[in-house]
From Swiss-Prot:
A family per Pfam: bZIP_1
Low complexity bias (residue ranges): 171-194
Region of interest (Disordered), residue spans: 171-209, 221-273, 344-364
Gene that this sequence comes from: MBZ1
Compositional bias per record (Polar residues), positions renumbered to this chain: 229-240
Protein name per the record: BZIP-type transcription factor MBZ1
Length: 557
């Protein structure tokens, strides 16, 4: 990874050369030549897309069309380009999800090998993970398009901030660099996996001819990595547009910008502006079409590159499968094939080594109550080391970790009755029955009153006889026609003297009705006297209740 030994200048991150001086003298800042340039921190040399140096600059219309901007929303394609750039650059988020730094650890490589000498134990780790794109310096779009030495001193003001197309080009270049780095790391990882291990294992009879063949194959695979086709450079036509000079204007634009054009009527100026804007729109549309065609060409090239990479990976996979098949067919792996055929599920992680087992250990029966510690420690066995028969230990007999295993138990034997120290009847204002004798009417207060209502008898409906229209309209059966039955109601005899058997009050007893309703025929004076007497009785009744409460409260005094 290449690093710059120079001190980083904050002014080098932003290009303020376009803002120096007035707009009429857009000369380059003399300090740009002395500012340090930072190289992209990439290991592999990648050809970044750049434009050929040219002095041709596109000129825009003389009229300021951005003065009255229409509310048209987003530019077509702006949102997709922005999301693509943010997704590529990981804007605002740290790239903690990539596990590229773990690619050097393969499952076949043991971190600690106690069977080998300390001098042979080498750790193969590569700390060359690609740097995040958020640490890259801000790239000036003018430096991507052409060199600063080839810029014309008469060019107009360029862009201060990079456009969407320049950001997309930069993101594409960075993605290609990361893809090439990942591919190289994948090739190196596969080479490390297929290379014979230098650490010493259990001694096995090796054939020098087979070892020589394996070495030759590995060397040939290292000499023939997956070839990558050169990336095609994408040419973008997103040059900074400058204001048109008077020499490049046509007659209509000169007339519109001159003093004579200001003297024209509003209608003529509107027609002239429409004509100029239509011409500018056609030129911009042509430019957009050319840009889209260039992007389509870039996508086609990228698709071809991906296909070539996929083909290279398929070829590499085929070569690795052939190598594995050839290695397994060699006599050096005969013991491994025998063990694999005998026990296909027990595939070891390292190189196959036959482990000597003591027949006495197989006769040892595992106790039923086995603690989890026993299974955890017994499974950690080093491959390639002779197993020493040991007596398994039941850790459940030690009662470890049972210090705080108590379970408190609480039982209720008896609950004393709480004395009724407060009389609720005294506080409520109602007379209690601790002096007087209790009556049976106190229990009736708890019961819910039942509302009496008269029972409704359902009227019995008599079914009507079916009527046959054909039979009734046929004159041949006129003699058999039935006449409608006439019902006559006979008045019932009512005993007006006693009125027995007649419900006058709708199911309510007459005693209750007479007790509630009383017919009084009196004058106004008698009525007022009766009302006053009733009020006096009501007040005296309330006074009696208050007096009784006071007597109850002052009884013990």
């Amino acid at each position: 990874m290449s690093t710059s030994s120079q001190t980083i200048d904050v002014d080098a991150l932003l290009d303020f050369s376009a803002c120096d001086g007035s707009y009429n003298s857009p000369s380059l800042s003399p300090s740009t030549a002395s500012k340090p340039t930072f190289a992209s921190p990439v290991t592999a040399a990648v050809s970044t897309p750049s434009l050929p140096s040219t002095t041709q600059t596109l000129s825009g219309p003389s009229h300021n069309y951005d003065m009255y901007r229409q509310q048209t929303g987003f530019v077509p394609g702006a949102l997709t380009n922005t999301m693509a750039v943010n997704q590529t650059n990981n804007t605002g988020y740290q790239d903690f999800g990539s596990l590229d730094y773990l690619s050097s650890f393969s499952p076949e490589n043991d971190v600690f090998d106690f069977n080998a000498s300390p001098s042979q134990g080498t750790m193969e780790m590569e700390f060359e993970s690609p740097a995040d794109s958020q640490f890259f310096p801000t790239v000036n779009p003018s430096s991507i398009q052409h060199d600063t030495s080839a810029l014309s001193q008469t060019s107009s003001v360029g862009r201060l901030w990079p456009g969407a197309h320049s950001q997309a080009a930069l993101a594409k270049a960075q993605a290609q660099q990361r893809q090439q780095q990942q591919q190289q790391q994948l090739i190196q990882q596969t080479q490390r996996q297929t290379s014979p291990k230098s650490r010493g294992k259990a001694p096995q009879p090796t054939d020098p001819i087979v070892e020589q063949k394996i070495t030759q194959l590995l060397n040939s695979m290292r000499a023939k990595p997956a070839s990558n086709e050169p990336e095609s450079q994408s040419v973008l036509n997103n040059l900074p547009k400058s204001k048109k000079d008077e020499e490049e204007m046509d007659e209509d634009e000169r007339l519109l910008a001159s003093e004579e054009g200001k003297k024209l009527s509003s209608k003529e100026r509107r027609q002239l502006r429409n004509k100029v804007s239509a011409r500018a729109f056609r030129s911009r549309r042509k430019e957009y079409i050319s840009q889209l065609e260039a992007e389509i060409a870039n996508k086609v090239n990228e698709n071809g590159d991906l296909r070539s990479q996929n083909r290279a990976l398929m070829d590499e996979n085929k070569r690795l499968s052939d190598l594995t098949r050839m290695l397994l067919s060699s006599p050096s792996f005969s013991t491994f094939l025998d063990n694999l055929s005998a026990n296909p599920t027990g595939l070891p992680q390292g190189s196959p080594v036959k482990i000597e087992q003591n027949p006495q250990q197989e006769q040892n029966q595992v106790p039923k109550d086995v603690n989890a510690y026993n299974s955890q420690f017994s499974s950690q066995q080093q491959i390639g080391m002779a197993m020493i028969p040991e007596q398994t230990m039941d850790f459940s007999l030690l009662s470890l970790g049972n210090t705080y295993n108590f379970q408190p138990q609480v039982f209720v034997v008896d609950t004393p009755e709480v004395p009724n120290a407060i009389d609720a009847s005294v506080l409520s204002g109602k007379t209690s029955n601790f002096v007087e004798e209790s009556f049976s009417s106190d229990d009736e207060k708890v019961e819910v009153p039942v509302i009496e209502r008269p029972l409704k008898t359902k009227a019995i409906e008599t079914p009507e006889a079916p009527v046959d229209e054909e039979f009734e309209s046929d004159p041949e059966f006129a003699l058999f026609h039935s006449e409608p039955a006439t019902t006559t109601t006979t008045p019932k005899d009512i005993d007006t003297e006693n009125l027995t058997g007649i419900d006058l009050f709708g199911g309510i007893e007459s005693e209750k009705m007479f007790a509630r309703y009383e017919l009084v025929n009196a004058t106004e004076e008698e009525a007022t006297a009766a009302f006053a007497m009733a009020r006096v009785q009501r007040i005296s009744a309330s006074i009696d209740s208050v007096v009784s409460r006071l007597e109850l409260l002052t009884m013990d005094i």
